[in-house]
Every structure is written in structure tokens, then in C-alpha cells.
């Protein structure tokens, strides 16, 4: 009798897990359908966004470029200067130092972690199983007055101080239209280590048949955040290869 109860419990647990996975996949299917279709997203070769970030009342122009082959960068325009951040050319990750304005390569660990991000163009959930990711429907949750589905996404492990750590994000999908309105994840390093980072998305608009959020915020959960307004999005932009290259003059200085 005990054996029968144990088997029944196992079957129930397995059935519940399968139903949960199917429900999470159904939510994603609705999401992709509502924003333009999975195949249309997969056909993208690149995205270029022009935006403005509001930081302490100051509007700072921001340009974001992401390409299908993994190359990407952000360009901040501040006091008439262009400051490149998070530039990845496929091998090297580098940024301009805000104080010296010189280009500096990132440490090996940061570069390896950044490389993992290239798997997520143009969307983390596309072909998630092939990437080795897992998803789980955690239930429902109200975010800023909106009822949402909470989906847990587990990506490839990150390396933090030489140790592998699970990379987990929680996505909150609006129950009415199935688009994500918030993403939460634990900060793994720096002064805010252990705190929860939250990104919010709203004002979805169509660009060449695909819907993107044109209003975003980034900050700590239940804390201050920096609003970002997208002014334009260009799909499949033409970007020169040298745009991502670590500056030659810096390379020459290292040789001398």
C-alpha cells in the first residue's frame, strides 16, 4: 500500500512538472505571436537603438548596437564626448574609462561571462532548450498593479570569483497581452552584490512588424531607477567592422 502511494505521488509530481512546463511554453508562444512571430525575430541580423537615459534629472543620449554574430556596444554621449561601453568584437570586451577616456580591456572572467550574453540575441527565450536553458512557471504575481505570469529562466552558469554560479532571471509577463513588463535578477558582484536588479518595460511599439518596448527603467528592486526612453529602432543596420575594434593606438602603446 505504501509503495502504491509512493508511485502515485511520483506520477502526480511528474504530471505537475510537465503541465507547468507546457504552460510556460504556451505563455512564450503567445508572447512571440503577439510581438511579431518567432521566425521574424530569428531572421534579424542586428538592432540599433537611439535612446535617452534620465539620470538625476539629466538626459543623456545613448546608442545601443547588437548584432546577430555577437558583436555589440553602447555609446554614451556626455559633454560632447562619445564614450563606448561594453564593446564586444567577438573576442575582446572593452570600454572607455570615464576618467581617462582611454580604452581598457575587461578582465578574462568578465569577458567570458559577457560572451554568454551573445546567445540571447534577439531574445533569451528563442530556442532556449537548444541553448541548455530551462524555464519554469512560478505562478502569478502583481507588478505595479498588473497581474503577471512569473517565469523563471535559468541560463548557463556565470563565473564569479572563479566559482560557477547559477544565472537566474525572473520574467513577469502581462496576463492580458503576454509581453514582459519586468525582469528581476540577483546582482553577482560589486557594491550591490546580493541585491535584486529590476528592469521594467512598457510602451510597446511596432517597428517593421516587430513590437519593442520604448520605455524602460533599470535599478534596484523597490529602489531608485534610471528611466530610459527609446527614440528610434533600426533593424538590420549596416555597421562597419572596425566600429567594434579595440583602438589601434592603445594596442601600439601596449607593445612599446
Task: Describe each model-derived feature in a short phrase.
Residues 45-47, 131, 167-169:
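A generic structural signal for short beta-strands and their flanking turns/coil linkers
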Residues 26-101, 136-137, 142:
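N-terminal mature ectodomain segment of secretory-pathway/periplasmic proteins
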Residues 22-27, 33, 92-163, 190-192, ...:
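Flexible, processing/modification-adjacent segments and terminal tails
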Residues 79, 147-244:
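Gly/Pro-enriched, hydrophobic low-complexity segments
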Residues 17, 66, 141, 173-174, ...:
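Hydrophobic alpha-helical segments, especially N-terminal targeting/anchoring helices
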Residues 1-24:
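Bacterial Sec-dependent N-terminal signal peptides
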Residues 47, 118-122, 183-185, 199:
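Short Pro/Gly-enriched beta-strand edge/turn motifs at strand-loop
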Residues 64-71, 89-91, 110-111, 203-205, ...:
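A short, sequence-level motif marking secondary-structure junctions
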Amino acid at each position: 500500500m505504501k509503495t502504491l502511494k509512493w508511485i502515485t505521488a511520483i506520477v502526480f509530481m511528474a504530471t505537475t512538472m510537465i503541465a507547468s512546463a507546457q504552460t510556460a511554453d504556451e505563455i512564450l508562444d503567445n508572447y512571440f505571436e503577439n510581438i511579431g512571430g518567432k521566425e521574424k525575430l530569428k531572421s534579424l541580423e542586428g538592432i540599433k537603438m537611439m535612446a535617452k537615459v534620465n539620470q538625476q534629472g539629466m538626459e543623456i543620449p545613448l546608442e545601443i548596437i547588437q548584432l546577430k554574430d555577437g558583436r555589440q556596444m553602447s555609446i554614451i554621449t556626455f559633454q560632447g564626448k562619445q564614450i563606448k561601453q561594453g564593446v564586444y568584437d567577438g573576442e575582446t570586451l572593452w570600454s572607455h574609462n570615464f576618467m581617462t577616456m582611454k580604452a581598457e580591456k575587461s578582465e578574462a572572467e568578465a569577458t567570458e561571462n559577457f560572451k554568454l550574453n551573445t546567445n540571447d540575441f534577439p531574445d533569451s527565450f528563442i530556442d532556449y532548450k537548444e541553448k541548455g536553458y530551462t524555464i519554469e512557471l512560478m505562478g502569478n504575481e502583481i507588478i505595479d498593479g498588473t497581474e503577471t505570469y512569473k517565469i523563471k529562466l535559468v541560463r548557463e552558469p556565470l563565473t564569479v570569483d572563479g566559482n560557477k554560479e547559477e544565472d537566474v532571471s525572473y520574467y513577469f509577463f502581462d496576463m492580458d497581452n503576454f509581453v514582459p513588463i519586468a525582469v528581476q535578477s540577483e546582482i553577482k558582484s560589486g557594491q550591490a552584490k546580493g541585491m535584486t536588479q529590476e528592469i521594467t518595460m512598457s510602451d510597446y511599439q511596432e517597428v517593421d512588424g516587430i513590437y519593442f518596448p520604448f520605455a524602460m527603467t533599470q535599478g534596484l528592486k523597490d529602489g531608485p531607477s534610471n528611466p530610459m526612453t527609446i527614440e528610434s529602432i533600426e533593424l538590420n543596420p549596416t555597421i562597419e567592422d572596425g566600429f567594434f575594434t579595440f583602438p589601434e593606438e592603445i594596442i601600439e602603446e601596449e607593445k612599446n
